[in-house]
Amino acid sequence: QLQERFRERDGLLGHLSGAIPGLLAPAGPLGQGQHFAMAGAYLHRDRLFPCTIGDGGLGEPYILSAFKHFHTSYPEVTNFLPVLIWNGFSQEHHSMVSLMDNEQMVAYWRAHDFERVILIDAKDYDDAGQEGAYVDSTRFGPEARRAFTRAVLEGVKAAADSALSGTLTVVIVKQLKGAGVHAQGAK
């Protein structure tokens, strides 16, 4: 019964499933998860509140403008950490930011007040010779996969420390959807 309150028609826009978004829930098409993270950060300034964001909705202005508005209002609150999964695809089409290069993506976040942008690009670790800007890390050999995984873990650790130390920070992980539901790209 509780889930009925959170369905799109009478509850949170974009949550058709009725699942109540948590702090680590994906941001969804209009970035609801990020608002829970920002609220948590405001209320509990000694804890980190990460939220995941997919690039499928990043073409919408709401996600980054909400971060910028929040930072303008509460510049001292930086203990929330967006983690962007940048894979070039929405569920059914290319994402609006799929044609950006790394420098443009970094500039996009910096334009919205993010002082530190930590971008981990799987392409930098590709030992399988994949073409295109987005590569599938599940095709890497063992050493390349370990190096990429290490870079992600170290990047997230550095980002967490940065966010908890008063610097507005984002982590961006750039790789093709390669495993799970999307066996190859976003087919």
Residue ranges and their predicted role:
Residues 1-74:
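Cofactor-binding active-site loop characterized by glycine-rich and histidine/acidic residues
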Residues 11-22, 47-49, 83-92, 112-120, ...:
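Gly-rich Lys/Arg/Thr-decorated short loops/hinges at beta-loop-alpha junctions or inter-strand turns
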Residues 23-24, 73-100:
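A short, conserved beta-to-alpha structural element at the edge of catalytic cores
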Residues 38, 60-62, 91-93, 180-182:
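Short helix/loop capping segments that flank catalytic or ligand/cofactor-binding pockets
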Residues 43-47, 70-79, 110-115, 158-167:
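Secondary-structure transition/capping motifs at alpha-helix termini
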Residues 53-60, 84-90, 123-125, 175-177:
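Acidic, glycine-rich active-site loops and adjacent beta-strand->loop/helix elements
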Residues 98-110, 187:
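Acidic, Ser/Thr-rich peripheral helices and adjacent loops at domain boundaries
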Residues 108, 126-187:
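Glycine/aspartate-rich loop-and-adjacent alpha/beta segment that forms the canonical ThDP
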